[in-house]
UniProtKB/Swiss-Prot annotation:
Signal peptide: none
Keyword Mitochondrion: no
Protein origin, superkingdom: Bacteria
Protein name: Small ribosomal subunit protein uS13
Description of how the protein assembles with itself and partners: Part of the 30S ribosomal subunit. Forms a loose heterodimer with protein S19. Forms two bridges to the 50S subunit in the 70S ribosome.
Family according to the record: Belongs to the universal ribosomal protein uS13 family.
PROSITE patterns: RIBOSOMAL_S13_1, RIBOSOMAL_S13_2
MF annotations from Gene Ontology: rRNA binding; structural constituent of ribosome; tRNA binding
Function per UniProt: Located at the top of the head of the 30S subunit, it contacts several helices of the 16S rRNA. In the 70S ribosome it contacts the 23S rRNA (bridge B1a) and protein L5 of the 50S subunit (bridge B1b), connecting the 2 subunits; these bridges are implicated in subunit movement. Contacts the tRNAs in the A and P-sites.
Keywords: Ribonucleoprotein, Ribosomal protein, RNA-binding, rRNA-binding, tRNA-binding
Protein encoded by which gene: rpsM
Source organism per UniProt: Buchnera aphidicola subsp. Schizaphis graminum (strain Sg)
One GO cellular component term: small ribosomal subunit
Disordered: region residues: 97-118
UniProt keyword annotation of RNA-binding present: yes
Length: 118
């Protein structure tokens, strides 16, 4: 099993799809990585040679992925909360941040409904 960026890449999938199992790499970035490594997008990971997998590793290392990206994301949210700006307050109260309506909807952000006790 090929290991790239600390993640076991599924070998039975095509290179384009297999790279998307890494957090921070979607289809577009996966396509760019395959192009830079001169690897056909439809070639399976199990068919690749060790040198080609090493090229993939080098290309993936150029991007912020996995733990570093998650840490960066949480620190950005924490920074907004510490600044007490509007977006930080919305994050703190678990409400939609980008101006969506909250009279109805916004259930994903707010969580399940709270029962009204009489």
């Amino acid at each position: 099993m090929a290991r790239i960026a600390g993640i076991n890449i599924p070998e039975h999938k095509h290179a384009l799809i297999a790279l998307t199992s890494i957090y921070g790499i979607g289809k577009k970035r996966s396509k760019i990585i395959c192009f830079n490594a001169n690897i056909a997008e439809n070639s399976k990971i199990s068919d690749l040679k060790e040198e080609e997998i090493e090229l993939l590793r080098e290309n993936v290392a150029k991007y912020v992925t996995e733990g570093d990206l998650r840490r960066e994301k949480t620190l950005n949210i924490k920074r907004l909360i510490d600044l007490n700006c509007y977006r930080g307050l919305r994050h703190r109260r678990s409400l939609p941040v980008r101006g969506q309506r909250t009279k109805t909807n916004a259930r994903t952000c707010k969580g399940p409904r709270k029962a009204i006790k009489k």
